[in-house]
């Protein structure tokens, strides 16, 4: 451990006979040599008055308070002494990481200006790289180029024109998207032709073992003979169907009833019915097989499966509105148009409708509310009429016309509806647009940075001296903001501010810290430990 003089400067190792080391270690000091201070003067006033304590070297105040401190350098005669007068120097009063130590003797207890204290704000953890990138993208500037850049680069006007066109295009696409969303909510159908094929085959009776296939005798058949029977097929398909996926025939109907001749098959076996159930599997056709060798008259009742459901109006209301079979929403719309056209809405109480003579006959009242119309209308709606087809099942082998074709109108989903749904559900274009927007934002940000660098260099080349001074003032302001040091510029510009007691102590601390730093550097270079 090196010796330390009264001024606080670290000293090289003294000779074995020196008394500074002993005084620093708390040993009894050697007799004072010529020109040296007496031994008791090296001891501090103790815990009550100084920074030193038992076993620690004391520091005497210098300057007007006492004689100038002197220390002896190695290799110098005792008579050659170097006085150290002026500022107080020495180690800081206590460890910077420990409790505050009392002030050195002769110094009034002053406190540091609270405005110069650094506020310790808890530092938040830095965001992750992915979060930082996302935050940066959210805080990016708009895609519009600043006016200064547009004035500097006239060619950038083409980019601004494209940006204006893109804005109009985005508005148009957004409006069309909303229109598509509204259109999908409504039933979007188109009428197509469904061709129904009704055919039948006849299997004559055969005797068992008859390989020639001749018919049995009219008088009767043996016990092992095969009974004559016929089979009816009902199939169909859409005409000019552009879709690749063919729709099943049964999916067009809600129910199918085949009514056979009641006189031939009796009251219990003359009806063949099929009704759609939640668990029904779609099929391409229907087959009915019955025994018999006579021509049979049959009636086919086909009930279409309308989506949304359609209803048949009361004949009186149908003639009045001009609507026979339609959806509930279409019927309500036609009814409102009739009320509006004939001015049946009450002029004062707008929720009431004044019935004319036709409405009085249909609704059996002279006045009704709007809210009562759905309830009144429910009793006037019926299920739509089924499609009726009369067909004769022929068992004559010479009859070549055993297949009949019937065309009916059906409503199918418009292919455009599927394209609309795919357009709304597709996110490929949105992802591509978002990626391009990110690139545009990054490019604009890079352009702004380059513009800032250009202005920096241009200002420096125009007037280097004023630029450097202004830049230093800016850096000083930024440094105060970064280090959280808030000072008073008006006080700091005056010399009296730096003659306060805290300034002398701060200088001593600073010099001591610098000496310690240089000492550590010297030890590292020499590879030794100075003791």
From Swiss-Prot:
What are the record keywords, sorted?
Chromatin regulator, Isopeptide bond, Methylation, Nucleus, Phosphoprotein, Transcription, Transcription regulation, Ubl conjugation
Asked if the record carries the keyword Hydrolase, the reply is no
On modification after translation, the UniProt record reads: Ubiquitinated through a signaling process involving RAC1 and the RING finger protein UNKL.
Query: Which CDD domains does the record match to this protein?
Result: SWIB_BAF60B
Q: What is its main location?
A: nucleus
Stretches assigned to the SWIB/MDM2 domain = 306-383
UniProt-listed Gene3D superfamilies: SWIB/MDM2 domain
Sequence positions bearing Asymmetric dimethylarginine: 81, 104
Question: How is expression of this protein distributed across tissues?
Answer: Isoform 2 is expressed in the pancreas.
Family classification: Belongs to the SMARCD family.
Query: What protein am I looking at?
Result: SWI/SNF-related matrix-associated actin-dependent regulator of chromatin subfamily D member 2
Species per Swiss-Prot/TrEMBL record: Homo sapiens
Instruction: Provide the organism lineage as a comma list.
Output: Eukaryota, Metazoa, Chordata, Craniata, Vertebrata
């Amino acid at each position: 451990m090196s010796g330390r003089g009264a001024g606080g400067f670290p000293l090289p190792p003294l000779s074995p006979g020196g008394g500074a080391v002993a005084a620093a270690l708390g040993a009894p000091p050697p007799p004072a040599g010529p020109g040296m201070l007496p031994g008791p003067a090296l001891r501090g006033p103790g815990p009550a008055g100084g920074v030193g304590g038992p076993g620690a070297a004391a520091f005497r105040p210098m300057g007007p308070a006492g004689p100038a401190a002197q220390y002896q350098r190695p290799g110098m005669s005792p008579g050659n002494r170097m006085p150290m007068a002026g500022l107080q120097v020495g180690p800081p009063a206590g460890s910077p990481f420990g409790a505050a130590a009392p002030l050195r003797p002769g110094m009034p207890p002053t406190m540091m200006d609270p405005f110069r204290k650094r506020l310790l704000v808890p530092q938040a953890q830095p965001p992750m790289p992915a979060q930082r990138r996302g935050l940066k993208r959210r805080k990016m500037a708009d895609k519009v180029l600043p006016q200064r850049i547009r004035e500097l680069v006239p060619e950038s006007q083409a980019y601004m024109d494209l940006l204006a066109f893109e804005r109009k295009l985005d508005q148009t696409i957004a409006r069309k998207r909303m229109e598509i969303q509204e259109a999908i909510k409504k039933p979007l159908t188109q009428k197509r032709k469904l061709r129904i094929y009704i055919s039948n085959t006849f299997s004559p009776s055969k005797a068992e073992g008859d390989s020639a296939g001749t018919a049995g005798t009219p008088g009767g058949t043996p016990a092992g003979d095969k009974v004559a029977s016929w089979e009816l097929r009902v199939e169909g398909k859409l005409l000019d169907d552009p879709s690749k996926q063919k729709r099943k025939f049964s999916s067009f109907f809600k129910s199918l009833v085949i009514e056979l001749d009641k006189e031939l098959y009796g009251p219990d076996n003359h009806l063949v019915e099929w009704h759609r159930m939640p668990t029904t599997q779609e099929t391409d056709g229907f087959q009915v097989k019955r025994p018999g060798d006579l021509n049979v008259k049959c009636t086919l009742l086909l009930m279409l499966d309308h989506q949304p459901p359609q209803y048949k109006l009361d004949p009186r209301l149908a003639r009045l509105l001009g609507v026979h079979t339609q959806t509930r929403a279409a019927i309500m719309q036609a009814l409102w148009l009739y009320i509006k056209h004939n001015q049946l809405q009450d002029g004062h109480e707008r929720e009431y409708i004044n019935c004319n003579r036709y409405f009085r006959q249909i609704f059996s009242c002279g006045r009704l509310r709007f809210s009562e119309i759905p309830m009144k209308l429910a009793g006037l709606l019926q299920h739509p009429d089924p499609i009726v087809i009369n067909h004769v099942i022929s068992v004559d082998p010479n009859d070549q016309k055993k297949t009949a074709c019937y065309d009916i109108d059906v409503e199918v989903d418009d292919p455009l509806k599927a394209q609309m749904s795919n357009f709304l559900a597709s996110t490929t274009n949105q992802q591509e647009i978002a990626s391009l927007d990110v690139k545009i934002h990054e490019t604009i940000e890079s352009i702004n940075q380059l513009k800032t660098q250009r202005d920096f260099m241009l200002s420096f080349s125009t007037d280097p001296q004023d630029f450097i001074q202004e830049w230093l003032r800016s850096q000083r302001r930024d440094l105060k903001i970064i280090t959280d040091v808030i000072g008073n510029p008006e006080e700091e510009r005056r010399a009296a501010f730096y003659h306060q007691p805290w300034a002398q102590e701060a200088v001593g601390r600073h010099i001591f810290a610098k000496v310690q730093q240089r000492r550590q550097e010297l030890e590292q270079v020499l590879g030794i430990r100075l003791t």
